[in-house]
Amino acid sequence: MTDIKKSEPAEDYPPEEGCYLRGNDYSPVAVVVILRWRREQTPADIENLVRVGVESGAALAGTLQTENIGIEKIICNVVSNPNIRYLVVCGPESPGHLVGDTLLALAKNGIDDRKRIVGTDAPTPFLFNVQPEFVKRFRDQITVIDLINEGSPEVLRQAVWSCYQEKPTLFGKYEFYDSGAYPAEPLSGKITWKITQPSLEPKSDEERAHRENIQTLIGRIRKAAEKREHSN
């Protein structure tokens, strides 16, 4: 039997709360089910996909709504468990947030110097609240399995099963096997919450400079008003 090396997750694993279920900590796969509805309107078939993910052997399985803070939470939870080497993304794509497309782009391209995920058409794909080290580890540690717009429990079950086989196993266009834990200590930490509304942040250097100029002008006006008030 092949010796597959496993390691202990961080003590606070999984550090971020969310709408997910926890399964086998030593499993090499986690499942993300795209949620395009309001949380309180989650359809039964989406909830079932989450359950199927964990029941099939995933370490974590849960829903994802947003292309920024939601992904930041996933990053923190994944890098705190080196055993997770695959991330299955399934369910109908969100036409607004494009969270599935954003996860694929993150894995392929990373982020730019403004912390924007490169190569996605999502409206606000910014990772302001996680360290660049966490983003790099996430990309190095996991392979994203694209099952976007796939809602079959049987297909998801087969994908998860394929990920924890000892020998390379074909699944569609992919070939999976459990290669063991990522060869580094887990990274432990939560998102900083420095920016809670990424959609309100400047989208370019020009927009940021314009806002800074406005703030400077407002500051000057306030100082002038205070000076006039004290002189009266």
PLM features per residue range, with description:
Residues 3-118, 196-201, 205-232:
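Conserved mixed alpha/beta catalytic, RNA-binding, or beta-rich assembly cores of soluble enzyme
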Residues 110-194:
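Divalent-metal-activated hydrolytic enzyme cores
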